[in-house]
Amino acid sequence: MLQILSVMKTIFIILSLVALSFISSEKESKSIHQFKVNDIEGKVFDFASLKGKKVMIVNTASECGLTPQYEQLEAIYKKYKDKSFVIVGFPANDFGAQEPGSNAEIATFCTKNYGVTFPMMEKVSVKGKDMCEVYKFLTKKSKNGLENSTVKWNFQKYLLDKEGVLVRVVAPTTKPDDTSIIEWIEN
């Protein structure tokens, strides 16, 4: 009888450990912190380095009517970067071919015209069959745990909490310094 109890106890412990590993991997899979991408200079950018920071991810373009949003993005980045907030830009040429340049050309444009200092990643696709993994995460509820979304245009914003969990999708036409975004950053 003691042997049976010992075996049952061992089985229970093993099953508990297996269940815990599934729970922890499920939590990690709902976080942006699992991704590594290349920045605009080709260096590896590890989203795990953003743990403890609120994150705004935005797809950008240099020849769009919304391109002046770079100015507001940079202003809020400068104001809040030392307060556990970061913006990560992803140039994309998916809408009206409004980001035709190379990574080097995009970097020069952003620096020269808007003084961009927030992290910019290499040019990616944010929709369709070539969609990058970060945007697959951001747009699929099964991956992000919040909602399915479609990137509607350049400068759509995704807001993630300090654990890297998606909390809100913001329309491209909503300005980066909109009151609701500033309140989210500050609270």
PLM regions: where:
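N-terminal "domain-start" segment that seeds a small globular fold
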Residues: 25-48, 68, 133
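Positively charged n-region of N-terminal signal peptides that target proteins for export
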Residues: 1-11
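Local sequence-structure signature of Cys/Sec-based thiol-disulfide redox active-site neighborhoods
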Residues: 51-56
